[in-house]
Each structure stands twice: as structure tokens, then as C-alpha cells.
């Protein structure tokens, strides 16, 4: 049986998921990168044969069951971290987005993480000090126009994190949410005004570092933390939304969103 710590990553073939996989692999963890992008998985496996890979459609519950059973067969049934990373974005106003794309964003970004939590629960519960990490976004702090379904889906991630943190408290599973602004991945190739005003400065390595930090709390106070910013601008946005009067926060968001 493998005695190293383990992490299962959805959407692990490219972008942030791939970077998280490499970060934890380099630290000696048993890493599972699962994705619907089989070509990306083949490339990852070719470059890093020790990373466990497999197909995962996050909108299909049976796919989750099969992928987790496959991965945990390498870990003795243990799972230290579930990284709910898979997500997609569509740009343009709601009236101009294809209905299928709108539905797909909700299915992957919302249903996907919920299925992941349900399927992984028994493995996380069976592992002392386990974590579930979900990939949120600063666009889940205040609604962002032109990427509205995506932004709304990240509000779901935020609320899901809060609720699951309470629901799983009895099982001693810690639940956290990573909330970056725009990251240098294909996901940022959208026509949102906020990408132009704020720029795309965060690297995938920065997000991977935040994921690592989130599952390694150093003290009691850090263990109470749920939301993790990645850069100063997204921290400022989160604090402004939390502590500013609603009209001020709205005006600030209007400036960002254009």
C-alpha cells in the first residue's frame, strides 16, 4: 500500500489542475489527475509517468464513482485532498450566449463539484485531516456582467463551500475555496471588461501555491479559514465587498466590470 498523502484533481490535464498536480507530485504526494481531455492526460502521463490519470466527466455521477474507485485502489482507500478544479467559462451577454453553453457552465461548475463531493465523501471521511478544495473565483464575490452564468456559478461554489464546511464538520473534513482573479490560462481568453481593466497577471503556479497553503494550515486560526485569495487585487475585492456599504461596493464593481 502507498503510504504517501494523496490528492485527486478534476480537470487535471491542463491549466491550474495540471499545475496543482505537479506541485503536489514534487512534494512526494500520490497524485491523480482526471479529466475529460484524454489528449491532455496522455501528454501529462508521458511526461510524468508516476501521476495516475484517468477519464472523468464531472457531470456524470457514475464517472466520478469509477474514477475515485480507480484512484483510491492505489492509496488503500484513503484520500487526503479532493481538488474540485474542473470548470468552464462562456463570455458575451446572456442574451447572446448559446443556451447549451449556459447549461454546460452550470452542469460543470455547479453540478460537477457537488457530484464530486458526494462521491468522494466516504474516502475523505476515512482519512484523518482530509480536505475538499473547490476552485472558486473573485467573480463569485460580486456579479460580473458579460460572463454572467460563470460568475453566478462561482457564487454557487462560495455558498457550497460555506454549507459543506458545516455539513462535514462532524466528519472532520475541512472545506475551502480558492478565489483568484483572472489566471493565465485558456479560461481567461474571454471578452470580459474586467480582464482588460485588471489584466491577467496571476500565474497557474500562484494558484497551485494557494491550494497547497489551503491544505496545510499552520494553526487553529488558519484552520477556521474558508476562502483563499491568490493576489492582492482579489483580496481587496473580497474585503471591499464584505466591509463596504452596498452602494460603494456596487460602484467599485461597476468600475471593474465596465
Ranges and model annotations:
Residues 177, 195-235:
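C-terminal helical subdomain
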Residues 137:
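Residue(s) in the substrate-gating loop at a strand-loop-helix junction
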Residues 1-32:
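Canonical Rossmann dinucleotide-binding motif of NAD(H)/NADP(H)-dependent dehydrogenases/reductases
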Residues 56-66, 99:
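The beta1-alpha1 cofactor-binding region of Rossmann-like NAD(H)/NADP(H)-dependent oxidoreductases
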Residues 93-106:
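Substrate-binding pocket helix/loop in short-chain dehydrogenase/reductase
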Residues 85-90:
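Conserved NAD(P)H cofactor-binding loop of Rossmann-fold oxidoreductase domains
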Residues 117, 153:
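Active-site helix of classical SDR
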